[in-house]
Amino acid sequence: MARANHCKSISWTYNEPTMWFEYTYDSAKLAQKNDLKTVYVTNGYMSSESLDIIAPYLDAANVDLKGMSDKFYTELCQAHLDPVLENIQTMHDEGIHVEITNLVIPGYNDSVEDLQALVKFVAEVDVNIPLHFTRFYPHYQMSDVQPTPVGTLDKAQKMAKEAGIRYVYVGN
């Protein structure tokens, strides 16, 4: 279908692609055979074994790095931070084009310390990794949290640029 519609790539997004890993793996292998690029939009929380399997067939990944504390990850995501950081590093080391998106949530991951830790991590992996800071809007189970102030996003962008990150974007 992608070739018939003259697509240049296939992206798995909106639903975590690792939740249907076998399908994305089979599709990625077919895509590569047909000269199509492949992109994961992912939370980055997958086993190292899964990443090792998909990496040869994955051209790019946008990883939603939700915060920089394990407390944040365990309380809000019921997960852990370290596997995500390790997978970002591995993707980069494997030659996968990596971009990172951080949804900045007031009172949760927007402190100067949190933002500095995120910027430091990205810069240490590679200052050429595009970094996207996006604005939180109240919804569903977090409807009591205020939208991210634009000034907070501007501050995050400034911190990232000062750390030498070359491609820093603010969105939403």
Protein language model features and the residues they cover:
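Conserved AdoMet/S-adenosylmethionine-binding subsite of the radical SAM
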Residues: 1-148
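A C-terminal junction/extension of Radical SAM enzymes
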Residues: 145-172
